[in-house]
UniProtKB/Swiss-Prot annotation:
Native species: Chlamydomonas reinhardtii (Chlamydomonas smithii)
Single GO biological process annotation from the record: translation
GO terms for cellular component: large ribosomal subunit
Entry's family note: Belongs to the universal ribosomal protein uL1 family.
Name of the featured protein: Large ribosomal subunit protein uL1
Domain of life: Eukaryota
A GO term, aspect molecular function: structural constituent of ribosome
Keywords per UniProt: Ribonucleoprotein, Ribosomal protein
Pfam family, one: Ribosomal_L1
Amino acid sequence: MSKISNDVLRESVSALVEGAKTKPRKFQETVELQIGLKNYDPQKDKRFSGSVRLPFVPRPRMRVRAGDVKHCEQAGAIGVDAKGVEDLKKLNKNKKLVKKLAQAYHAFLASDSVIKQIPRLLGPGLNKAGKFPAPINKNLEEMVLDTKCSIKFQLKKVLCMGVAVANVGMTEGEIRTNIMYAINFLVSLLKKNWQNVRCLYIKSTMGKPIRIY
C-alpha cells in the first residue's frame, strides 16, 4: 500500500516541471528520486540491490554499448555505440582507460562470447563501477529499450541514495507513473517496507528538491 498522497505527488510534479520551464536548459533535465532511509544498519543489515523496468524511458539519451561482430552491426543500425573484442584489447587493462570507458556509458551489453573474455581483457574495472555487461539474450533493440527503461537501487554505506526516474520532457502523467513504479519497487526491497523510509524527494537536475513524503 503506497503512502504517497496522489494530490501531493501531482502538485509536486507540476511544480518541478513548471520550474524547469521557467529556466530552459540546453540539455534535457532528468528527474531524480532522492531517498532517505531509517532503521537500517548498512554494516549489519543485508545491503539490498535490485533493478526494475519502468513504463517510460527515464533518460532518452542514455548511452548503451554492445559488442561482437554480429551485434556490432545490429547496434550500428539502431544508433547504439559498439566495440568488438579487438577494440577492448587495445585498452590493455589500463585502469584509467577502463574507468573512463565505464564513466562514458550508462550501461553495457555484450554477446556471450565477449562476456567470458571481459575479466581477462579489462580486469575488474567495469564490475567495480557496477556496470558489468548484461548478456544479449534476445533481440538487441528490445534489450536496449529494456536497459534504457531500467533503474537500479543499491544500498551502499550511507542511508541515502538518488536514482534518475524520469526527465522533464515527459508528460506529468508519465513522470508520476515512473515515480510510483520506482517507489513501490524500492519499498518492496526494504526489510520493513515503509517503516524504513525516512523521506522522499523529487528533484530536476538544476531545480530544488521537493519533498513528497
